[in-house]
Structure formats: C-alpha cells, structure tokens
C-alpha cells in the first residue's frame, strides 16, 4: 500500500512540469492606451504573471491584475518588470492589464508570460495536517520544481528583452557607421575640390 502511494506521489511530482499552462506574449501598447489579456483560471490554482517592458520611453508601464468579480488584486505603477504569484479564490476570467496612458507619444513593447498550475494529487496531500517524512519531501520537491519552472520562464523573457536590446543597438551602430562613411566621403570630395581650386588659382597667378 505504501509503495503504491509513494509511486503515485512520485509520478505526480514528475508530471508537475507538464501539468501547467504557460502562455507567452509580446505586444505593443500604444500611447494613451490600455491593453488587457484575459485568461480563464480554475478555483484554488496558483498562477504566476511575469512581464518586462523591452522597448519604449523609460521602459515603464502600469500593470494591474483584476479578478473575475472586478476586484483589483494587484496594481503597480510605472514598473519596468515584475513577477507576481497569486492563488485564485474562485474560478473565472482574470484580466491582466497594461496601461500606457501616462505616455502621450511613446509606444511600449511588453513581453508577458502567464503560468497557471493545474490541480494534482500533490495539492490534496498539502491539505493534510499530519504529513509523513516522505510526503514532506515530496512537497518540498514539488515547490522546487515549480520554482525552477518559473525561473526558466523568467530567463526566457529576459533573453527576449536582451535580444531586442542587442538588435536595436546593432541597428543604431549600423546607421551611425553609414553616417560616418557619408561624412568621410563628403569631406574627401570637398578636400579634392578645394585643392584643385587652390592649384588652379595658383597657376593663374
């Protein structure tokens, strides 16, 4: 009996990595506009929302999480990035809103990752008051697996932001090089013209 129970716990732990919904978005929020992402989440599920402003102005934006009963469960102003983990009180559609209303001219590009956990036997074990040493170990490992998944998602988002920054820098360097080349060519043409005029005037004298 104990072996069967332990086997079930181990299988549940190994399946945690696949028993969650992970959605990733990159989108533009225009100036003076608010954009929202809607996700239906079941009752008593843990969900993690991660975002980063990867381009635009001072790379800041207002971020709000709204529950299905229209209650604001989190609100942050002028944030460049953030990670928020919550547990759903009841089932329904949650809203994740990004407001760029503070900006009158500049659009913002946002990278957003939403990870929603699924129910599993691990959750039922967590409700027990008295846990065996094996169950406590499984719970600790479960929390560790979830933390690693969230870190992977976070680094994926940061990698996208750094890639965007590198591409933007490369573009600026390219155009600056083109501008420098144009200036050098213009100066060379002017110097040739000036020297020719100088010697023509000197011969005439």
Swiss-Prot record:
Membrane topology designation: Single-pass type I membrane protein
Main location: membrane
TM spans (from-to): 173-193
Key words of the record: Cytoplasmic vesicle, Membrane, Protein transport, Signal, Transmembrane, Transmembrane helix, Transport
Subcellular location: Cytoplasmic vesicle membrane
GO biological process: endoplasmic reticulum to Golgi vesicle-mediated transport; Golgi organization; intracellular protein transport
Cytoplasmic topological segments: 194-205
Stretches of the chain found on the membrane's Lumenal side: 25-172
Domain GOLD stretches: 34-116
Pfam families reported in the protein's UniProt record: EMP24_GP25L
Residues annotated as signal peptide: 1-24
One GO location term (cellular component): endoplasmic reticulum
InterPro entries named among the record's database cross-references: Emp24-like, GOLD_dom, GOLD_dom_sf
Taxonomic superkingdom: Eukaryota
Keyword Transcription regulation part of the UniProt annotation: no
PANTHER family (alphabetical): TRANSMEMBRANE EMP24 DOMAIN-CONTAINING PROTEIN (PTHR22811)
Role of this protein: Could have a role in the budding of coatomer-coated and other species of coated vesicles.
Family: Belongs to the EMP24/GP25L family.
UniProt-recorded name of the protein: Transmembrane emp24 domain-containing protein A
Source organism: Dictyostelium discoideum
């Amino acid at each position: 009996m104990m072996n069967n129970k332990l086997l079930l716990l181990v299988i549940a732990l190994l399946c945690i990595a696949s028993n969650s919904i992970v959605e990733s978005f990159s989108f533009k929020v225009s100036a003076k506009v608010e954009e929202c992402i809607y996700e239906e989440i079941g009752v008593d599920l843990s969900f993690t929302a991660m975002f980063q402003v990867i381009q635009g102005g001072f790379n800041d934006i207002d971020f709000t999480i709204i529950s299905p009963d229209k209650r604001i469960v989190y609100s942050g102003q002028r944030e460049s990035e953030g990670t928020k983990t919550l547990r759903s009180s009841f089932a329904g559609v949650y809203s994740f809103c990004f407001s760029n209303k503070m900006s009158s001219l500049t659009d913002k590009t946002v990278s957003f990752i939403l990870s929603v956990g699924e129910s599993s036997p691990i959750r039922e074990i967590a409700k027990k008051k008295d846990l065996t040493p094996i169950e406590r170990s499984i719970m600790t490992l479960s929390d560790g697996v979830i933390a690693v998944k969230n870190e992977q998602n976070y680094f994926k988002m940061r990698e996208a932001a750094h890639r965007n920054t590198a591409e933007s820098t490369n573009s600026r360097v390219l155009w600056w090089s083109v501008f420098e080349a144009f200036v050098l060519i213009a100066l060379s043409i002017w110097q040739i013209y000036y020297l020719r005029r100088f010697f023509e005037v000197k011969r005439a004298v």
